[in-house]
Amino acid sequence: MGSEMCIRDSVYTPTRVFPMLPERLSTNLTSLNPEQDRIAMVISYTVGPDGTVEDGTMRRARVRNYAKLAYNSVDAWLEGNGSIPQAMAEAEGMADQIRTQDEVAQRLRQRRFEDGALDLETIEPRAIVEDGRVVQLRHEKKNRARALIEDFMIAANGVTARYLEAKKFPTIRRVVRSPERWDRLETLAKQLGERLPIEPDSKALSEFLLRRRQADPLRFPDLSLAVVKLLGRGEYVLIRTHDDEAGHFGLAVKDYVHSTAPNRRYPDLITHRLAKAALTGRQSPYSNKELEDLATHCTAQEDAAEKVERQMRKSAAALLLSTRIGDHFEGIVTGASPKGTWVRIFDPPAEGRLVRGTSDLDVGDRVRVRLAHTDVEQGFIDFER
């Protein structure tokens, strides 16, 4: 099973999830199902009033999930737009606990932004499938409950990295390097009447993004996507010593591993194996060469999985629109170059190429387009004016 997990990765498509683990493990024995005891790794840490994370501890434990909650219902409750979820109300003390966690999560988030973390907002519509048919594309908006979990996971990943470092263990870090194409980001800022420093500076970029979100919220998702592409992809890298400067530019952190999803991602499972060895005073179960090879392999596996997921999202959008040839849509130009002009329509949220009527258009222009053609297999959507 170990070799199978190494060559697989969890892949999420509109119609089916392909888990890294066999289904009995992924959805049952390793899943935090309600009212079931599970063996787990617990990461404990203290968060100061200013959102600073103090290094914590790791330990093995038996945990129990007392309520199965959904992001959307918890988000509505936290925002004051919905009643308390029934499962939460029935679990003694849980509502107060989640209120406290929400407050702490916001402090963690604010601290990261002050340190230069990037607050991006890209549009990746999720296909809604009913009876095997794509019936809708839904843009998942920012969700306070989901952000709560993300904030605690980011903090836990940092604590885990520093814990293993203190134990003199090598680690596979999650790295987004300082952008090599920073000059392109400078040019992008100038086109919007802004300035960025000559050298990469995540705090300056974060402040630029905040200003642009406030100035032009409609076009901000497209700006976010352009920034993501220019930042470059994330990768897994073997880190042997604290002196290594590799960090996560987008999160504005230096010490960062993936550790919170060992039943979905192989790098997280490797981190757990390292942590368990450190906890029991054993040597690393991997040599540095093995970890280096695994880091390269896991990066390639992740890239392959993401490529499949992107293609499936494009095909799902093309399939949904395939019955609407000739219909007109309101949209915005997201790309304009000699290679082609691209338009993002608002409803349903989808992007395609403008194959006719491209003259005098520039990025950010509002347009009304007609759907001319779709190719489901290729994931192509063609518009014209």
Q: What positions do the PLM features span?
A:
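Electropositive polyanion-binding surfaces
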Residues: 4, 8-355, 359-365, 374-381
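Short, compositionally biased
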Residues: 383-385
